[in-house]
Amino acid sequence: MERPSLRALLLGAAGLLLLLLPLSSSSSSDTCGPCEPASCPPLPPLGCLLGETRDACGCCPMCARGEGEPCGGGGAGRGYCAPGMECVKSRKRRKGKAGAAAGGPGVSGVCVCKSRYPVCGSDGTTYPSGCQLRAASQRAESRGEKAITQVSKGTCEQGPSIVTPPKDIWNVTGAQVYLSCEVIGIPTPVLIWNKVKRGHYGVQRTELLPGDRDNLAIQTRGGPEKHEVTGWVLVSPLSKEDAGEYECHASNSQGQASASAKITVVDALHEIPVKKGEGAEL
């Protein structure tokens, strides 16, 4: 019996392929069927906040999904992400059974912003991502307000503000005392301490600390949070000359802020009044 030639085998394989192609294309078209806009589910009365997309068959309009909302999947509930986002399958599903492999029919994920870094909006607000900025802008426009645009990447710059001001202190000569102050701002502020001398007509002058004082030290460190700075004034031993008003002053390119507290020096503990100012310390 003669073996079939290579040419005959190739011709037979090509013929079989031609027979199978119409079957696959007809099954795909049968899934969608003719487009009938009248049978499409209605959109929300106020429209789609993130815009519209089309269903899997390209027929019915549907609302685009936002960040963190489900996407993918199969059937009528299939969702598509808004522009600037991508549908990401969970690791559990990717490691699951073969029938639930990533990209397979029926597999769903969540919409994730492609740009995953903070941005500064024209309203002075820092948004975790460009997608959240666009969503906020669309909400503003739906209320008849001005659109929000991206000013820059990263967090918005802001002037310093006092997180924890220094507190008034009462103590005896020879003691060790300290004042502390915590500030925040973007860029991170520069913190300095001044001793303020006031007269009858307001501030007379300020003395930048530590100056030439042997019993006074200044310490500053970043934190505890990002863009925060904490500073201390340590006085040891305390003398009568150290009494007065001390100012915590913070500044950056966006502005400045300050807060002050007083150190009161007495000769004996019994001289300290029972009721001191709110926030005062020994």
Swiss-Prot record:
Positions modified as Phosphoserine? Answer: 239
Q: Where is the IGFBP N-terminal domain?
A: 28-114
Q: Which UniProt keywords apply?
A: Cell adhesion, Disulfide bond, Glycoprotein, Growth factor binding, Immunoglobulin domain, Phosphoprotein, Secreted, Signal
Where would one find the signal peptide in this protein? 1-26
Sugar attachment sites are: 171
Its BP terms in the Gene Ontology are: angiogenesis; cell adhesion; cellular response to hormone stimulus; embryo implantation; negative regulation of cell population proliferation; regulation of cell growth; regulation of signal transduction; regulation of steroid biosynthetic process
Give me the disulphide-bonded residues.
32-57, 35-59, 40-60, 48-63, 71-87, 81-111, 120-156, 181-248
One Pfam family linked to the record = I-set
Any single GO CC term annotated in Swiss-Prot or TrEMBL for this entry? extracellular region
Kazal-like domain ranges (all copies): 105-158
Q: Which GO terms describe its molecular function?
A: insulin-like growth factor binding; receptor ligand activity
Q: Which residues does UniProt call coiled coil?
A: none
The free-text function statement in the UniProt record for this protein reads:
Binds IGF1 and IGF2 with a relatively low affinity. Stimulates prostacyclin (PGI2) production. Stimulates cell adhesion. Acts as a ligand for CD93 to play a role in angiogenesis.
The entry describes its oligomerization and partners as:
May interact with VPS24/CHMP3; the relevance of such interaction however remains unclear. Interacts with CD93; this interaction plays a role in endothelial cells angiogenesis.
Q: What name is this protein filed under?
A: Insulin-like growth factor-binding protein 7
Q: What is the originating organism of this protein?
A: Homo sapiens (Human)
